[in-house]
C-alpha cells in the first residue's frame, strides 16, 4: 500500500504525537535535533487531512473500556469517516470491536 493510493486522515492529535515521538528519539540520541526538525517538515509535507476531535469526544469516552483516549481518537475518527484504520499497533488492531476495517502495517 502506498500513500498516494489512499486518502489519509488523522486526528489533529497526531501532530503532537509525532513531535512527542521525535522528542523521545532525540533525547535517546537516536537522531539529532536537526534530523528531527527535518522529519517534522517531511511529516508536514505528507498529503494528510487533519481533523479536529471536538465532535468525537462523546464517542472517545464511549470507547474507554478498550482504549486510551489517544487510541480511541483514531478509532472514533475512522468510524466517523467510515474509513479503514491503518495501524502498526497490533494490540490496537486486536482491541477494535466495531465494524471498523483494520489494516495493519508490517
Question: Language-model segments: what does each one mean?
Answer:
Residues 10, 51, 69-72, 87:
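Short beta-strand scaffold positions
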Residues 1-28, 52-53:
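PIN/NYN-family metal-dependent endoribonuclease catalytic core
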Residues 12, 35-65:
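Acidic catalytic patch
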Residues 11, 63, 75-106:
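Acidic, PIN/NYN-like endoribonuclease modules and their adjacent C-terminal/linker elements
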Residues 17-21, 39-42, 59, 77:
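A general alpha-helix detector
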